Swiss-Prot record:
It catalyses: acetoacetate + butanoyl-CoA = acetoacetyl-CoA + butanoate; acetoacetate + acetyl-CoA = acetoacetyl-CoA + acetate. The acetate and butyrate conversion reactions are inhibited in vitro by physiological levels of acetone and butanol. Heterotetramer composed of two alpha subunits (CtfA) and two beta subunits (CtfB). This is Acetoacetyl-CoA:acetate/butyrate CoA transferase alpha subunit. It comes from Clostridium acetobutylicum (strain ATCC 824 / DSM 792 / JCM 1419 / IAM 19013 / LMG 5710 / NBRC 13948 / NRRL B-527 / VKM B-1787 / 2291 / W).
Length: 218
């Protein structure tokens, strides 16, 4: 079996301007901060970022916002980062807000090859603008389109050398769903162990979905 473990400098060829990147985490809980720092140092631009939030100014995903690397953001919450709001109102950043449950279902749909998600969330609000409505048995739904990415950056609490990944507590959040929905998946391992050290029933993301593992500081 070829090793999935890779050094940060060998990831450079995977990233370029204009990419769509999913980043796991919830206000920096379960967020691959070393991989984000790596992206900041690469200074690639015009990115579309799919994430739950943009954390805080100059923290986590907020570093990408502060460094003017993001062209479009698809997220459920931006209130904790004033920089995101300023860029939105100054027309420096396109923001698509998606309710949190809808966002994760759109990601799950993308990973499962589904054509979209039907939901009543957002009906009668600004969320429905420009979206198709479908009536089923007399009930109206919004059609939310699936989300996929070129690369997903996720974080695992324990990752074995085959890529099987365990998330501790709420660090799970968006990570396992994003691992299903991208062409290339890179996991930042908090603890990297040999294959026999992680009980397979604890693997929340199977190694077959993981392309690369990083551990050392960027």
């Amino acid at each position: 079996m070829n090793s999935k473990i890779i050094r940060f400098e060998n990831l450079r060829s995977f990233f370029k301007d204009g990419m769509t990147i999913m980043i796991g985490g919830f206000l920096n809980c379960g967020t691959p901060t070393k991989l984000i720092d790596f992206l900041v140092n690469l200074n690639i631009k015009n990115l579309t970022i799919i994430s739950n939030d943009t954390c805080y100014p100059n923290t986590g995903i907020g570093k990408l916002i502060s460094n003017n690397q993001v062209k479009k953001l698809i997220a459920s919450y931006i209130g904790s980062n004033p920089d995101t709001g300023k860029k939105l109102f100054n027309n420096e950043l396109e923001v698509e807000l998606s309710p949190q449950g809808t966002l994760v279902e759109r990601i799950r749909a993308g990973g499962s090859g589904l054509g979209g998600v039907l939901t009543k969330t957002g009906l009668g609000t600004l969320i429905e603008k420009g979206k198709k409505k479908i009536s089923i048995n007399g009930t109206e739904y919004l059609l939310e389109l699936p989300l996929t990415a070129d690369v997903a950056l996720i974080k695992g609490s324990i990752v074995d050398e085959a890529g099987n990944t365990f998330y501790k507590g709420t660090t799970k959040n968006f990570n396992p769903y994003m691992a299903m929905a991208a062409k290339t998946v890179i996991v930042e391992a908090e603890n990297l162990v040999s294959c026999e050290k992680l009980e397979k029933e604890k693997a929340m993301t199977p190694g077959v979905l993981i392309n690369y593992i990083v551990k050392e500081p960027a």
